Structures are given as structure tokens and as C-alpha cells.
Amino acid sequence: MKIIAIRIGDRYGPEYEKYLEEKLPQHEFIWIRKPIREDVLLQWNKMYGMSLDIEEPIVVMDIDVLLINNYDDLFNYPIKRGQFISIPGWWRDTENKRYKINGGFFKYYPKDCKYIYDKFM
């Protein structure tokens, strides 16, 4: 499975990449180190995965995730075509309780989400 992670700028050093690659050697990393377009703000670069023309699910994750215990279960969590999986948000920065996803970890089939990329990018 491919994992996409963003490391743009100097807030996080290459040791963060090394940490994730050592924890997840069975996966292929795609590192986004510069904006996919000049007009794209940092967090929106995560949408790059939705533009990929591949038939397998991918994970898009934050670079500053600490992997502990049996984290393979998270990456191996089953997903069906048409599903979009995220871990729950642990903070409440809004009063709307319907907003539950965490932007730090997504799993989806890129081709199923291409329409989102096309609409917003």
C-alpha cells in the first residue's frame, strides 16, 4: 500500500520521514516536499492522493503521528470501494458534533475520490 505524507517547509526534519519509514517498511511512501501547485495551501496538498490513477487503497497521513502498540491494525483496516475511512477526531474545535473525522489519517481508493480533487483543485 502507498502512504502519502506531507513534509513542506522546515517545521519537521527528515528524521520524521525516517521514523515513519522504519516503522512501516512494508509500505511505499510518497513524500510531498513542495506544494503540488503554487496556489495550494499546505494542508490542501493532502488531496494529491485523490489525483492518482491507481486501483489500490492509499493512506494519507500527517508526518507527526506517533505509532505505538499494534499500529499495523490501523493500516490493515479493511476498506471497500467507495468508502472513505478516517480515525476519529480527539479534539473538539467546533460545537457541531457531526464533525468527527481527524484530518491526520485517511484511507481511500484514489479513483473513487477523483471527483473531489477535480471539484476543489
What are these regions (language model features)?
Residues 108-121:
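Catalytic core and acceptor-binding pocket of nucleotide-sugar-dependent glycosyltransferases
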